[in-house]
Amino acid sequence: MLPLNSVRTHAGRLVPVMLAALFLAGCPSQAPQSPAMQQRVEGKAGASSDYYLQQMQQSSDDSKADWQLLAIHALIQEGKLPQAGNQLGTLPSQLGDKQRQEQRLLTAELAVAQNDMNAANTMLAQLDVKSLSPQQQERYYQAQIKAAQDRTSLTLIRAYIGLEPLLQGDAHQRNIDQTWTALTRLNQQDLSSMVINVDENTLQGWLDLLNLWQTKAQVPSDLQAAIEDWKKRYPRHPAAKQLPSQLGGTPPAAAAPTTGETAPTGGNAIALLLPLNGQAQAFANAIQQGFSAARSGQASLAMPAQPAQLAQAANNAAAATPGAPAVPSPASSTPSAVSPTPAAATTVMPALTAATAGTIPVKVYDTSNQALANVIAQAQKDGATTIVGPLLKNEVEQLPGLNPSLNVLALNQPEHIQPNPNICYFALSPEDEAADAAQFIHKQGKQHPLILAPRGNLGDRVVAAFAKSWQQQSGGVVLQQRTGSMYDLKQAINSGAGIPLNGQPVITAASAPQPSTTVGGLTIPNQAPPIAAVTSDGNVDAIYIIATPDELALLKPMIDMRNKGASRPALYASSRSYQAGLGPDFRFEMEGLQFSDIPLLTGASPALMQQVSTQFRNDYSLVRLFAMGMDAWKLASDFSQLHQPGSSLSGATGILSASSDCVVNRKLTWLQFRQGQLVPAS
C-alpha cells in the first residue's frame, strides 16, 4: 500500500507515472531519461524502498541511478538511515545535473535526519534553489527549517517565506503561524542588525506587521485599525490574505505535520482526538486552539508569577471586561470523577524546548462520526505514538476495554479508574476543584467544613470529592447542605431570615458501615448510626459554596445575615462563581470570600488572558478549555514525566501533578475579595 503522504501532490498522475517507469525499465540501455522519471526523482517517493531497490536491480545503467535516488528518498522517509547512507555512497560518480542536485538534496535531508545540522547546512549551501523543481524547493526549505532547530534567525525566517507559496490549505496557515512565531522571538538587537535586500518586500512587510503588533497590542481596537491599514500597503503579502492565528486568522483545522515532516525513528508523534462536529464542537475547538497555540509557541505563561502580581492582573482584567455574560465553569459540561492522591511536588518537569516542539508532528482526528476503536487504529497506522483525547466521557470510559498500546492522555475521566500504564487522565472537573479546595481549606487551619452545593448530580459529585479529599487530610467529618433554584433563593432572601446552616454529615466509602454481618450462615443487616443535625451554632468554621455568580449574590448576604460577629465561618467558592466583568457592587458584596480558578484567568499572563478572552467573547468556560489545550500539549509532548513520582508542572490550568493511577491533579490559584479588590488569599 502506498504511503498516505504521496496523495497530496501526485494522486492525479500516480498510475501513468508508474506505467511510464515500468516501460522505462524494459527499454534499451541507450533510451533517454523521460520527463516523467525526472518528476519522480524530484518529487516525493511514493512507493516503498524495497520496490525501488528491486527496480534498480532490474534496470539498465541509464535509469539505474534514477531508481537508486528514489530508493534513497524512500529509505530516509522510512527512517532506515544506515541503508540510505550506504546507497548514497554507491551512487555512480557520473550523474546528470538534475541527478546531482537530487543527490545533494538527499544528502542534506539524511544529515538532518541524523541530527548532523552542520553537514546539512553545508550541503544546502551548495544548492541553487532557483534551479530546483517546485517539489525539490519544498523539500529544500523544509530541510533548512529543520536544520535551524527552531533557533530564530534571518535564515529561518527566509526559509519560511520561501516555503509559503509552495503550500496550500492548512499547511499554508501553519506556515504563516510559524513565520509569525519566529518573528516574535527576535529581540531588539536582532531587528536592529538585520540587513534586508531591496527585493525582499515580503520580509519587509512581516517586519512592519511585527512593529505594529509590538507597539499597539495593548489596545486591540488600535491594533485592528493598524492591521487594516497595513493590508492596504501590502495587498499581495501572504499575511494580508491569511493573518497569523494570533492576530485573528483562522487556525488550521488539523495540526498535521507540514509537507515533508516525518517523525524521527523512535520519536514522538501526537494524534489529537476531538469531536469536531456536534454539541461538543465549541469545546473541542477551544481545546484545539489552545493545543495548537502552545505547540507553535504563540501561547505560554510567564510562570511562576508572584501572588500579588496575579491578583493585580485579575483586578485589571475584571475592570477591563464589564458587562460580560455569566458563564458557568466548563466542569459541569464535562463531568468526571476524581480520585485525588496528593503528590509531594518536589521535582519540576523541564520545559519543552522550542526545538523539540517543532519536531513533534501532530494530526487531529474527528471522533464525532466514527467508532473510537477505528480512530485509534487509524492514528496508530499513521504513525502516532501518543494520543491526546478523547474528550467525551462515554468515549473515555471505553479506553480500558480497548487496551491501547499507545500512550493516551484522555481529556476526561471515567467514574472509576482502572489503572493502565498507557493511560493518563486530564480533566477540568468540579471534583478536581473540590479536592483542591479541601486541601486549601485544611491548610488554613479549618476543622469543620460545610459544603453548600446545588441539588442534583453536580452537587453529589462535588460533595463526594470534597469529603474524600478532606478525609485524606484529617479524617474529620464534612457536612453538606443543598441549595434550591434561583426562585427558591429569591423567596428565601425576601423572607429576611437568612440561611440556617443545617448540615448533614457526608457518608463516604471510608466511613460507611458494612451493609451486613453474617453469623452462622444468617445475614444480619447492620444498623446505621443515627445522624444528628448540625447547625452553625455548633462548630462550622468554613463553608465551600458551589454557585453561579447570580446565585452567590443571593447566598452570601443570607449567610452573613444569619451568621454575624467574629465567629462567622470563612467562605470559599469555586471557579463557577468567577466570570468576566464582575462589577464593583458585586466585588464589595463578596467581601472576605475566597475563590479558586486557573492561573490563566487569575493573571499569570495578562496579555494572553486579554487576547484569549476577547477571542472567546469573555466566555470564561471556553477560555478554561483553551488553557486545557495548552496544558495537554505540555503533558503529551513529554508523556514520561507523568509517571515520575513527585514531579509537577506549572501550567495554564494550575500546578499539575499525577497520582499513582496517572490522574492529573491541579493545584489552583486562590484569590480573595477585599475592599472591592482581588488580593492573594492568605
From Swiss-Prot:
The keyword Protease does not apply. Regulator of peptidoglycan synthesis that is essential for the function of penicillin-binding protein 1A (PBP1a). Residues 248-262 have a biased composition (Low complexity). This is Penicillin-binding protein activator LpoA. Its main location: membrane. One of its GO terms (molecular function) is enzyme regulator activity. It comes from the Bacteria. A lipid is attached at C27 (N-palmitoyl cysteine). Belongs to the LpoA family. It is found in: Cell outer membrane. Residues 1-26 form the signal peptide. The gene is lpoA. Residues 240-262, 314-341 are annotated as: Disordered. A lipid is attached at C27 (S-diacylglycerol cysteine). It is a lipid-anchor. GO terms for cellular component: periplasmic side of cell outer membrane. Interacts with PBP1a. It comes from Dickeya chrysanthemi (strain Ech1591). GO terms for biological process: peptidoglycan biosynthetic process; regulation of cell shape. The lineage of its organism: Bacteria, Pseudomonadati, Pseudomonadota, Gammaproteobacteria, Enterobacterales.
